[in-house]
C-alpha cells in the first residue's frame, strides 16, 4: 500500500485523453533527446501529463475530504472542450527554459479552477519542505507549490501541459495548432520533483454518468 507523508504536496488536475498524453510524451522525448538530464520524463504511469487546477500542501488525513469535494464538483461539470493553441515557454527559478502546451482559458475551465480552489483552500496545511513530495524534491519545487495560490491562481491562472526543460520548437512536425480535445477526467495527485504528477490518489469522471463517486485508491 502506498504510504503518504503527514503533509502531502497535492495537485488537483484535469487529465487529458490518451492521444493528448501521447502527444505530450512525444514532445517531452524530443526535449530529452537534446537534454538527457532534463529532469522531467513524462509517461502514463509515474509522471502524467496533466493540467494543474489547484496545488497545495495538505494533511494526509484531510485527503478523503478533499477527494469528496473534488468529486462533487466534477460530477456537476460536463467534459470540457479545450484548445492547445501554442507552445509556451518561461524561465524557471534556476534559469532554465521550461516548455509547455498552452491551453486557452475558456470560461468553463476558469470557473472549474475557481470552484476547486475555493473548495480545497480550507485544507491548506503549513508546509513541510521536500518531505511533502513523492521522492526527492528540490527547493524550487517546494517554492512552486507554495507560490501557486499567489502567482498562478484565479485571475493569474494560465492552463497548460508542462512538457519539460528545454526549448521546444514552436512548429512541431505532425502537430498543427490549434489542437482541440475534450478533458473528461479529473484527479488528485501526489506531486513529485518539478511539481510533476507522480501518483494518482483519486480519479473522477466529469459529469453525472455514474451514481457513485469514482475516487480510487492510488494505483501504486
Regions found by a protein language model. Give the residues of each.
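Basic, often amphipathic N-terminal segments
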Residues: 1-83, 89-92, 111-190, 199-220
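Acidic/polar active-site rim loop that often engages polyanionic ligands
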Residues: 93-97
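Short histidine-centered catalytic/ligand-binding loop motif
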Residues: 98-105
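Soluble or luminal CAZymes and related metallo-dependent hydrolases
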Residues: 108
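Extracellular glycan/ECM-engagement signal in secreted proteins
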Residues: 193
